[in-house]
């Protein structure tokens, strides 16, 4: 295996259907994947290096990006231990970024500058705690961006339980008729006045409730704009960074994921479930 590269910083398209998911076997243009990874995690310290099977989590995430067919895969980190964990993983590069970034978006913007991507490059932001992210989903979010003409793209899935609908840790969203996001919220949106007045132990009929999947795509040029924008009022209230984009008047295209994304890993209990899932595979 070849060691990774280590770097430091010194035309109109058709709109995406709002009703249908992106087909997983559609041809797509080239895209790159960047994985923000930091060692400090309040609920699961050293999360990227936690073992799933006999390999650290960050290696599993990088594998998913490679399986999706990304032209380049980069891990953006400020921690030498995470960089070392990528050594020997063919096809993956490391961007050593600043330790003062306040968000993964800031870290990815620096990674894009280190990588030297031109403004039109399609960049997929794959979270570092998604070791089982489906390759079809990673490709799909790139396709959404490329076809929609929006500044940013993401994925969603139907809400299938009342628990998730009312759980503030499960982010919900609503779209317009063209498939663009109208709003993201920790609240159950849209609020079904009649159904919720009587009971809140089931998801009302109608397939109107979507939960957000935290994978994004943007052009490298817009990524720099996004990182430079000041936080918006709605972003501060909901603690959802993507609201900065909507509040500034930009589009976020949303499509249904072609394949289910397993939950990310945030806690020791999540890690145990991931280890059990791999063992049973």
From Swiss-Prot:
Record bears the keyword Transferase: yes
InterPro entries: Cytidylyl_trans, KdsB, Nucleotide-diphossugar_trans
Broad class of the protein's primary localization: cytoplasm
SUPFAM superfamilies, alphabetized: Nucleotide-diphospho-sugar transferases (SSF53448)
Gene3D superfamilies: Spore Coat Polysaccharide Biosynthesis Protein SpsA, Chain A (3.90.550.10)
Domain of life: Bacteria
Catalytic activity as recorded in UniProt: 3-deoxy-alpha-D-manno-oct-2-ulosonate + CTP = CMP-3-deoxy-beta-D-manno-octulosonate + diphosphate
GO biological process: CMP-keto-3-deoxy-D-manno-octulosonic acid biosynthetic process; lipopolysaccharide biosynthetic process
Enzyme class, UniProt record, top EC level: transferase
Pathway in which the depicted protein is active: Nucleotide-sugar biosynthesis; CMP-3-deoxy-D-manno-octulosonate biosynthesis; CMP-3-deoxy-D-manno-octulosonate from 3-deoxy-D-manno-octulosonate and CTP: step 1/1; Bacterial outer membrane biogenesis; lipopolysaccharide biosynthesis
Location(s), subcellular: Cytoplasm
Annotated protein name in UniProt: 3-deoxy-manno-octulosonate cytidylyltransferase
Organism from which the protein derives: Xanthomonas campestris pv. campestris (strain B100)
Lineage: Bacteria, Pseudomonadati, Pseudomonadota, Gammaproteobacteria, Lysobacterales
């Amino acid at each position: 295996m070849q060691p990774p590269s280590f770097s430091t910083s010194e035309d109109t398209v058709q709109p995406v259907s709002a009703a249908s998911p992106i087909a997983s076997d559609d041809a797509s243009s080239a895209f790159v994947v960047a994985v923000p990874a930091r060692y400090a995690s309040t609920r699961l310290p050293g999360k990227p290096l936690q073992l799933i099977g006999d390999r650290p989590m960050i290696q599993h995430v990088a594998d998913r990006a490679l399986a999706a067919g990304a032209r380049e895969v980069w891990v953006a980190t400020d921690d030498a231990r995470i960089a070392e964990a990528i050594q020997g993983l063919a096809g993956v590069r490391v961007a050593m970024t600043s330790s003062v970034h306040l968000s993964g978006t800031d870290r990815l913007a620096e990674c894009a500058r280190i990588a030297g991507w031109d403004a039109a490059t399609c960049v997929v932001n794959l979270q570092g705690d998604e070791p089982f992210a489906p390759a079809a989903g990673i490709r799909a979010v790139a396709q959404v961006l490329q076809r929609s003409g929006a500044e940013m793209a993401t994925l969603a899935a139907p809400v299938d339980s009342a628990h998730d609908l009312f759980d503030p840790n499960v982010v919900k969203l609503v779209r317009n008729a063209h498939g663009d996001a109208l709003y993201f919220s920790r609240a159950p949106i849209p609020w079904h006045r009649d159904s919720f007045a009587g009971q809140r132990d089931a998801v009302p009929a109608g397939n109107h409730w979507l939960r957000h999947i935290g994978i994004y795509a943007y052009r490298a040029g817009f990524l720099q704009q996004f990182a430079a924008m000041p936080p918006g009022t709605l972003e501060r209230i909901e603690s959802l960074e993507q609201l900065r984009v909507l509040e500034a008047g930009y589009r976020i295209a949303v499509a249904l994921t072609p394949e289910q994304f397993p939950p990310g890993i945030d806690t020791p209990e999540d890690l145990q479930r991931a280890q059990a899932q791999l063992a049973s595979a």
